[in-house]
């Protein structure tokens, strides 16, 4: 009867994007359900903003107690300017998907868990707010044809 996981789909993309089933709300940023979703959001936004693709999804999978992700996957749905495997390589060179590093690189512990109260209304994505560090686009280096 707890509150964790009550609005999983609304917290993300309202059913438009794929979702692994892990909840964000009620979890601290060390949990990959939350931090993993944030880093793949930043990676996907950066791919599109850099012009590598018009649309994409970035997926990451983890196992408990394993410090590295089991897999990272990119699908540009055929909109990529270069092959998806090359986009994936650029993403892996730019983003650190290790759980501990996500928290550090996105500064997720700043301000304690109180900063996540804002996510209770209007979700976790799509807002320009200094506390939503995962919404900041990182420049990606690639050779434009």
Swiss-Prot record:
Its main location: cytoplasm. It is an enzyme of class 2 (transferase). L-methionine binds at residue 31. Its EC number is 2.5.1.6. Binds 2 divalent ions per subunit. The metal ions interact primarily with the substrate. Can utilize magnesium, manganese or cobalt (in vitro). It comes from the Eukaryota. PROSITE patterns: ADOMET_SYNTHASE_2 (PS00377). GO terms for molecular function: ATP binding; metal ion binding; methionine adenosyltransferase activity. The keyword tRNA processing does not apply. Mainly in floral buds and roots. GO terms for biological process: one-carbon metabolic process; S-adenosylmethionine biosynthetic process. Induction: By fungal elicitor. Belongs to the AdoMet synthase family. Catalyzes the formation of S-adenosylmethionine from methionine and ATP. The reaction comprises two steps that are both catalyzed by the same enzyme: formation of S-adenosylmethionine (AdoMet) and triphosphate, and subsequent hydrolysis of the triphosphate. This is S-adenosylmethionine synthase 2. It comes from Petroselinum crispum. The gene is SMS-2.
């Amino acid at each position: 009867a707890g509150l964790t996981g009550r609005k999983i789909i609304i917290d993300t993309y309202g059913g438009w994007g794929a979702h692994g089933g892990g909840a964000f709300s009620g979890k601290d940023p060390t949990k990959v359900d939350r931090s993993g979703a944030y880093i793949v959001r930043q990676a996907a936004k950066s791919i599109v903003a850099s012009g590598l693709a018009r649309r994409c999804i970035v997926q990451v999978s983890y196992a408990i107690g394993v410090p590295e992700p089991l897999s990272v996957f990119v699908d540009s749905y055929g909109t990529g300017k270069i092959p998806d495997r090359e986009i994936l390589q650029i993403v892996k060179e730019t983003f650190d998907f290790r759980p501990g590093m996500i928290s550090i690189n996105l500064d997720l512990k700043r301000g304690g868990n109180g900063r996540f109260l804002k996510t209770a209304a209007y979700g976790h994505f799509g807002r320009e707010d200094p506390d939503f560090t995962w919404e900041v686009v990182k420049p990606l280096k690639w050779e434009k044809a």
